[in-house]
Design a protein with these regions (language model features):
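Intrinsically disordered, low-complexity regulatory regions of eukaryotic proteins
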Residues: 1-54
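An acidic- and aromatic-residue-enriched active-site/binding cleft used to recognize and process polar
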Residues: 32, 114, 157-159, 198-200, ...
Length: 334
């Protein structure tokens, strides 16, 4: 009779899964490849793909600490405001975070060509304008801050700055009056400046004229860029035209309330307050290659024909970029 084979009871403990069970105890399953059992391997894989998810408790704690510090600064007055009213602390901790759900989840904004924006130093961003309300300007401002850390100082119409609450918040978020003096002042201190030459003609145009650029005025933004010797970055925003499609403009009511237009959309005023909810269109913002003005010299700002031609060049770049991206997108909402 052959000798029986003796199986040792302890020939080395098999490796156990590195995960924990739902009640916080160590998992007793045998570990497979990667140190996790078959049950917990998918969860570990998800954490590897999204490392911030594993740090979520720490992220929440960090956010709470930042908000407490913010509250202390507001109560003690220990926060800077520049001489044009820009409150960086309020903007970064309150105003921009309020816009992020719209940017990330509602309009799902994609940005192209952010690398064309200089990391520092003065730059003039020139964009199309649309959407009934100037939300496109806010999305551009937020997108650039989140990807570059730069604050874009927007030039706003006097009407926007005169509105109660809105005007005050506009000033605190770094915006200023659309005039040459303020624009040059900001550029000469190294700021990124955003301008929308179409003005109310662009943001309040009917839906049938969507993505057709209106006049760019007399080229005031080009004169500013030439006098400051800064690059111009053309910006094309696709998606804002669909958030409040204007089907009619009640001019008598606009005159009565002192507004540039009184829009009628498919949902406003038909649905009352619900008509103020923008439609969830899919957005794309593209930043074109900079147009360098330094070599032209400041005296070029006094040449009306040169200013007109450069204005037309910037406008044409934006218009062609809009057409290109409209052709490429599958649907206004996806």
């Amino acid at each position: 009779m052959a000798d029986a084979r003796v199986i040792p009871l302890h020939q080395g403990e098999a490796a156990r899964c590195a995960a924990q069970t739902a009640d916080g105890r160590p998992c007793r399953n045998r570990a497979g490849a990667g140190g996790y059992c078959a049950r917990h391997a998918p969860e570990a894989s998800a954490r590897d793909r999204h490392p911030t998810a594993a740090l979520e408790p720490n992220a929440i704690q960090k956010w709470l600490e930042e908000m407490l510090a913010f509250a202390r600064r507001r109560m003690t007055g220990d926060y800077p405001i520049d001489d044009m009213g820009f409150d960086r602390d309020l903007t970064e901790h309150v105003l921009l975070p309020m816009l992020r759900p719209l940017y990330r989840s509602w309009w799902r904004v994609d940005q192209i060509g952010v690398e064309n924006i200089p990391a520092d130093g003065p730059v003039l961003l020139v964009s199309n304008h649309s959407g009934t309300l100037p939300l496109d300007a806010l999305m551009m401002k937020l997108g650039i801050f989140d990807q570059t850390g730069r604050h874009v100082r927007l030039l706003a119409a006097d009407l926007a700055l005169a509105l109660p609450v809105v005007g005050e918040l506009a000033r605190k978020s770094g915006n200023t009056l659309a005039c040459e003096e303020d624009a040059l002042r900001l550029l000469r201190t190294g700021e990124a400046l955003g301008v929308f030459p179409e003005g109310f003609k662009g943001v309040g145009k009917p839906f049938r004229e969507r993505y057709r650029l209106q006049r760019f005025g007399r080229g005031g933004f080009v004169e500013v860029a030439l006098r400051a010797g800064v690059p111009i970055v053309p910006v094309a925003i696709v998606g804002a035209e669909e958030i409040f499609p204007i089907v009619a403009n009640l001019k008598p009511l606009a005159r009565l309330f002192g507004l540039p237009y009184f829009p009628i959309t498919p949902t406003f005023p038909l649905l009352g307050p619900l008509g103020a909810i923008p439609l969830p269109s899919k957005w794309m913002i593209e930043y074109g290659e900079p147009i360098h003005t330094e070599s032209f010299g400041t005296e070029a700002a006094n040449d009306p024909m040169f200013v007109f031609n450069l204005t037309d060049q910037v406008r044409e770049v934006i218009q062609q970029t809009l057409f290109k991206n409209l052709i490429q997108r599958k649907n206004a909402f996806f």
